[in-house]
A protein has these predicted regions:
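Exported/periplasmic ABC-transporter solute-binding proteins
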Residues: 1-42, 47-60, 66-89, 95-239
Length: 239
């Protein structure tokens, strides 16, 4: 996994969204060692990241879900030929630590868990959009509408679940839930979404047209998408 080289040392900025943060942070540290460049990593909710990239903020590499990257390409906000797949993330369900955990092996069990939940907490980004649509597809949108709470990102979602009554359910990206559990947040992972209704989100990186150090940014984007990077992402729950 070669980072490339440059005569001038640059400070590169990665602005990203989603559960690839841990893997990206580890890879950024590796890129710094190999290239001599400095890399700052900032992650936020996908809608906010999209707004900033579309507004031509001075970002070198943007990392967002596939649909957002498609929009960046359509609007000419990323450099052609620099887009690369970081990995794919799946969704899961969490409750407050110590709360009872329902067995959710299939779609019917998921549907019942949603009907039984005192609150269904999800983000305002793609994960939350998917859950709201899924509840409608399952025919329980009306029954659950008043109990759905949308928050800016998965961290806020799971912090709310940790401080909520035991019957609240949080839904988000598995990798992010697992990271928060490891950090000691008072939540417990119940299960991934059942296979029949699982939602897989692909995360892509690309150099933005606003980057002021295109050569170094291209080297960083290649480093993040290199075959050797897959093992780093896999270790954080991204495949």
């Amino acid at each position: 996994m070669s980072a490339g080289s440059a005569e001038t040392v640059s400070t590169l900025k990665i602005l990203g969204a989603g559960p690839v943060k841990r893997g990206v942070s580890r890879l950024a540290a590796g890129f710094e060692k190999q290239s001599g460049h400095r890399v700052t990593v900032e992650f936020a909710g996908a809608p906010g990241v999209s707004e900033r990239v579309l507004a031509d903020e001075a970002v070198d590499v943007a990392i967002v879900p596939q649909a957002a990257m498609d929009e960046f390409e359509k609007r000419g906000k990323v450099v052609a030929g620099t887009r690369g797949l970081m990995g794919r993330s799946r969704m899961g369900i969490a409750v407050r630590k110590g709360a009872s955990r329902a067995d959710i092996p299939d779609t019917e069990a998921f549907k019942q868990a949603m009907l039984d939940a005192g609150a269904i907490v999800c983000n305002v980004a793609s994960s939350g959009v998917y859950i709201v649509k899924l509840l409608d597809q399952l025919g329980i949108a009306d029954a659950t509408r008043d109990r759905i709470l949308r928050l800016p990102d998965t961290v806020k979602v799971m912090e709310h679940v940790a401080g909520s009554p035991a019957h609240a359910i949080g839904v988000g990206q598995l990798a992010e839930i697992s990271e928060l559990v490891e950090k000691g947040l008072g939540i417990a992972l119940v299960a991934p979404l059942p296979d029949a209704i699982q939602n897989v989100t692909a995360y892509h990186a690309a150099v933005t047209v606003a980057s002021r150090q295109q050569d170094a940014a291209r080297a960083l984007a290649r480093f993040l998408a290199a075959p050797e990077a897959k093992a780093v992402f896999a270790a954080t729950g991204i495949d």
